[in-house]
Amino acid sequence: MAAGRPGTGCGDHPLLRLSGIPADFLERRPAGPGAGAGAGEAAVRRAGLPGRGGGAGQLAALPARRRRRTGRPDTGLPHARARSRPGVFRRAGAARGGGDLLQPPAAGAHPIPRRPRRLSRRAVVRRKLRGGLRPLRRPPRQRRMGFRQPTELRQAGAPAHRLHRPRTTHRHAVRRAPGRRREHPCAARTADGGLPAGGGLAALAAGGEDGRDRPGPAWLSRRRQHPALAGRQRARLSAPRRQPRGRLVSGHGGVLARRLLWRVLLFSLCFTVLAGAVQLFFEYRREMREIEARLELIRSGYLASFERSLWDLNQEQLNVQLRGLGDFPDIARVSLQSADFNLLQGDQRPRGMLRVERFPLSYQPPGGERRQLGELEIAIDLAAVYRRLVSGGLASLLWMGSFLCGLAVALSWLFHSLVTRHLWRMSEFAGHIAEGDLQQPLRLDKVDRERDEIDAVAAALEDMRQALRTDRRRRDADRDELRRQVERRTASLRRAKDQAEAADRAKSRFLATMSHEIRTPLNGILGMAELLREASLGERDRQRLRALATAGEGLLAILNEVLHFARLEEAPDVPEAVDFSLRSLLEDVLTLLEPRARENATRLDLWLDPQVHDGHRGAEQFLRQVLTNLLGNAVKFTEAGEVRVRVERLARSAGSERLRLSVADDGIGIPEEMRERIFERFTQGGDAVTRRYGGTGLGLAISKRLVEALGGRIGVESRVGQGSTFWFEIELALASLSGATPPAASVSALEVLLVEDVALNREVAQGLLERDGHRVMLAEDAGPALALCRQRRFDLILLDMHLPGMAGLELCAGIRRQLDGLNRATPIFAFTASIQPDMVRRYFAAGMQGVLGKPLRMDELRRALGEVGTSVPALAVDAALDRQMLETHRRLLGRHKLAGLLGNLLGSLDEQLPLLAEALDQADLAEAANIAHRLSGSCHSMGLVALGAGLGELEREALGAAGVDPRAWGARLGSLRRDGAEALRRAGFLGEADSAAG
């Protein structure tokens, strides 16, 4: 079959184009067995390709000289040297034309090896000039990527860029299974191992242009290779490509390089804009100076000539002068106006921004007065100036921007070349380490072998790999031992935790018991002392009474300090921040300690910095206790001296100020070795001081804890025999006080229920209350208390928390759940010796409104009674209404619409309650339950919780078929309805008119 015809696949093959052979050359050659020895085959041989044609003709066409030089017998078998170099034979004896040049010799053919003739440099140049030989070189990209070509194919004359074979380490390397012989990708083979029909060029075309698609026959790429190297190469080809888990960059570009590029570009843009703006500003100033210079030139050099010409009435000269001015740069219009002439040079109505300058023209003849001749008007075209500035600025901006962008790109490329590609390699290495592969070392592909920071990081990563390997081996060895140690330690910690929890529970029980057992008799001692103060006693008995009261107060102070410090160690309290007056607080503390100071002949002095704001907001309770402790110590250790309290402002910021409060005395002082430990618990100045002055040594420790809880610091300065100065610094928020606190109003007589099981405590509390005019009812336990609450309404209920049979919390809940509701809104105060913070929170959570601690103080009792009068309405409102629900309704519906709905509800109640009472009278419990159910749902949906709860309770009793008292329920529902309407009016949800209408 002729080449170039269908089936050959080589008539228009790229190898023919690259070798310089015409496309129709093979078609023009004669067909037949001996046609391969003609001029066409000679041209093919000159081009460096094996000839094509019949086998016998080709063999006959060989010169006799070459046949004699080979000297090989016609055995029909390939020579040993020929077998070692497959693919370079010229087939002879083929019956068909266009045989494959790259196919193994057929059986019976006599293969003759052919060596490529080496040409001298002169011959190569001569052939290049004639156009018969084109040097074939690998393209630069192939040389750069490291492609190589088989020696056999080069000797066969195939083009290098078509028959190249990539290195196995390249990412486009053909992967094959282990044990499979490597074959050239350009040689396609048939099922029996041979090449497809159509010749070697057709086989190359079938293999694809890039030669990476189809594997060739095994004999085409048979090479000698070391077995170990071959095995390593197979392992590299068969191993899957691993991807690190944490990729530093995507693709071949680095995130850091792109980020650097964008930031440099952004900086370049900002710098370019700024530089352009600065340059534009200076150019603008230069243009304005030039305009001013031209105007000054006109003023100094042209006005005199204009005045002379105008005086001489020389119009021609004036026109010439105007044209001269019009030739100045940026002059849009020049006009001369006078009584004789109106001359104009330039546009009559120029467009754009103009700057108009007018110069008056006057002339003074010799010996005469100066006369006004006219006015010269010059219009300067600022738009032209601005256009020139903009064009120049844009040009410089583009130039600088291009330069800086190029610089940024160069820097980013350099950064990628020097840094990010190595970071990518190190990220892959770190990914392998993260996956647990610690066998592969880290190697960087660096052109510059000089060590730098990247090498330091790589060395650190390699050291980390070695350390991880060592640590893994050591960790595996220590794992079992560590597990056993952890188990033993866990068991020990669990036992210690159980013991600590048991000790903490025992401590809490001990403190609660101690507080209750000591405060209860103290309440009787101090209460009786308070009652006996107004009794008719002699002077000696009064002194004994004062001694008794002083001893009781001292015992109470010690108890309070011990319990307070225990609470602080357990969990420091954070009292509520309130608004207070600092001056009033200091005066109250000084007034409290003034009797003790008078006994020691000690004078108290207060100095308050005028710059200190009076109103503050903060933990007034903590501050009061710290001042009381410090002043109490100063008064106790000072005899016939002076105690000075100073308050100064250290700094002030928006909404707060930092204060320094100091308490100085002239007492005994503190030794130097004790100053560092003076704020520790149970620490005093020494054993002699403890024996002489007494005390627990907890006051300063408590003060330090409280100051630290306030965010401040505390310290002391002292000298033995000269006195001490205790100071602390805190920061307080500023507050505006509404005004002076009004004096406490006299409390009207109240109905008080006192529930106390100890007779002495009942007698003390009753005596103190009755002395102020209050009426007191007594109850020993919960039963009589509940009975009294059902019979009458009280203004205040005092409950002891430790009652026989029923605790005070349960009794409070029972009073709140009483059906008649007489005392459901009555204030209930806890009257107990258990005043720990967690207990106080439980009291308030149970529905109590206050706590009175034992021993009972008269001032605390009066303060609580004073709050009762104002708290009762609020408590009644809170018990009758769900304020949160009503506030939500008012926010969604509006005030007027909510008032209308509440009025309709009250009107519906007025209509339905008589029907409900009638159903109860007629014993129609089903109808009564139905009406109560409807009204209860309406009341609950509108926030009348007390009335809704009463109706719900009535519904349950009616459905239970129990005995229902119609008269009691009628009175109760009427009272609940009136209380609900009054609560709505007091809370502002219902006006007077709406309430009356309801």
Curated annotation (Swiss-Prot):
The gene is aruS. Signal peptide: none annotated. Residues 27-82, 154-198, 224-245 are annotated as: Disordered. SMART domains: HAMP, HATPase_c, HisKA, REC. It comes from Pseudomonas aeruginosa (strain ATCC 15692 / DSM 22644 / CIP 104116 / JCM 14847 / LMG 12228 / 1C / PRS 101 / PAO1). Its EC number is 2.7.13.3. The chain crosses the membrane at residues 264-284, 395-415. One of its GO terms (molecular function) is ATP binding. Residues 40-49 have a biased composition (Low complexity). GO terms for biological process: arginine catabolic process. Keywords: ATP-binding, Cell membrane, Kinase, Membrane, Nucleotide-binding, Phosphoprotein, Transferase, Transmembrane, Transmembrane helix, Two-component regulatory system. Pathway: Amino-acid degradation; L-arginine degradation [regulation]. Residues 894-987 form the HPt domain. Residues 161-183 have a biased composition (Basic residues). It is found in: Cell membrane. Member of the two-component regulatory system AruS/AruR, which is involved in the regulation of the arginine transaminase (ATA) pathway in response to exogeneous L-arginine. Probably functions as a sensor kinase that phosphorylates AruR. This is Sensor histidine kinase AruS. It is a multi-pass membrane protein. Pfam families: CHASE5, HAMP, HATPase_c, HisKA, Hpt, Response_reg.
